[in-house]
Amino acid sequence: MIKKKKKKSYTSVYALGQYISMSTHKARRVIDQIRGRSYEEALMILELMPYRGCYPIFKLVYSAAANASHNKGFKETNLVISKAEVNQGNTVKKLKPRARGRSYPIKRPTCHITIVLEDISFYQQYEEYLMYLKNPGCRNEKRNLPCYETYSSGGPWDKK
């Protein structure tokens, strides 16, 4: 089996729940509703959905946010669920005793759920910095050179 190398990310945290006794299909039905949403919105959705699989996923999202605030110092208002995936786990097999000395097998499916939260405040600051860098003549008012848009047509470098 090939293992993926995890890149060290400075803006994301994750929580992993393993061997949760739930079918992967039922867990994916809930996970698809919260993927890409903000942390607070996801908690509200999970509290109001009527499925049994919401509670373990709610605990995982809450745990990932606690990891973000405790380990990296992120604010919970800036967190977004960037990645949420459900993988199939082991199937727990039991025997149910029946009449006349017989037994029926019972299969309990399990799943592994991974929730990744990202801090979007870093990206907003990065976009502001890029906007600041796009107009190089405008950031120094001491210069006497005119400020041209770098991507506009009709600038001094467009002439042949």
UniProtKB/Swiss-Prot annotation:
The keyword rRNA-binding applies. Pfam families: Ribosomal_L22 (PF00237). GO terms for biological process: translation. One of its GO terms (molecular function) is rRNA binding. The keyword RNA-binding applies. GO terms for cellular component: chloroplast; large ribosomal subunit. Keywords: Chloroplast, Plastid, Ribonucleoprotein, Ribosomal protein, RNA-binding, rRNA-binding. It comes from the Eukaryota. It is found in: Plastid, Chloroplast. Its main location: plastid. Part of the 50S ribosomal subunit. This protein binds specifically to 23S rRNA. The globular domain of the protein is located near the polypeptide exit tunnel on the outside of the subunit, while an extended beta-hairpin is found that lines the wall of the exit tunnel in the center of the 70S ribosome. Belongs to the universal ribosomal protein uL22 family. This is Large ribosomal subunit protein uL22c. The gene is rpl22.
